[in-house]
């Protein structure tokens, strides 16, 4: 499966740095996360991915500095790919830099909102995942726990 989230209400004031926006997506079925790809434009600075589990535990899964010149998919190794029970909320946090200090910023004097043009900005992300059955999730979780306790888990 493949999921893309938009943050169409993006609001980046002129000259502002570290402008935060948040997006959420609920995993309806047990899943294994395969990859994460942040996507912003010239003012994109950083994007982080958190899992908010049904028991309200929060785990940071990925946090990357963003560079518009590099469109990178961060793939997880099989042994550490996040295993997500049904009901897990994916929380994506994005930061933008609309200041003069951002060398990629075409004009820090202007307010910037969502748009598809490079001179606009966005805070999108793509999640690549596949669904698992409850039994598959339990078995994989148990196997990882066993490997971790035996010291045989590979990263």
Report residues per predicted region:
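Conserved small/polar residues in nucleotide/adenosyl-binding loops
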Residues: 1-5
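Conserved, well-structured core segments that form or line functional sites
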Residues: 7-11, 26
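Solvent-exposed, conformationally flexible loop/turn segments
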Residues: 14-17, 87
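Short beta-strands within extracellular/lumenal beta-sheet-rich domains
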Residues: 16-27, 74-76
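Extracellular and analogous surface-interaction loops
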Residues: 22-32, 80-85
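Extended, compositionally biased non-globular segments
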Residues: 35-118
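Glycine/proline-rich low-complexity spacer/linker segments in large multi-domain proteins
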Residues: 101-143
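Activation corresponds to long, low-complexity, non-globular regions
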Residues: 138-155
């Amino acid at each position: 499966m493949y999921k893309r989230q938009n943050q169409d209400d993006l609001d980046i004031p002129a000259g502002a740095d570290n402008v935060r926006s948040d997006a959420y997506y609920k995993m309806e079925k047990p899943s294994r996360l395969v990859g994460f790809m942040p996507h912003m434009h010239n003012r994109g600075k950083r994007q982080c991915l958190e899992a908010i589990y049904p028991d309200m535990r929060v785990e940071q899964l990925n946090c990357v500095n963003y560079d518009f010149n590099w469109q990178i998919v961060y793939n997880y190794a099989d042994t550490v790919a996040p295993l997500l029970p049904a009901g897990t909320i994916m929380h994506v946090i994005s930061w933008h830099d609309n200041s003069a200090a951002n060398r990629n910023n075409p004009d820090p004097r202007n307010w910037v909102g969502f748009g598809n043009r490079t001179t606009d900005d966005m805070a999108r992300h793509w999640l690549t995942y596949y669904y698992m059955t409850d039994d598959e999730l339990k078995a994989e979780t148990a196997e990882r726990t066993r490997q971790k306790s035996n010291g045989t888990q590979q990263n």
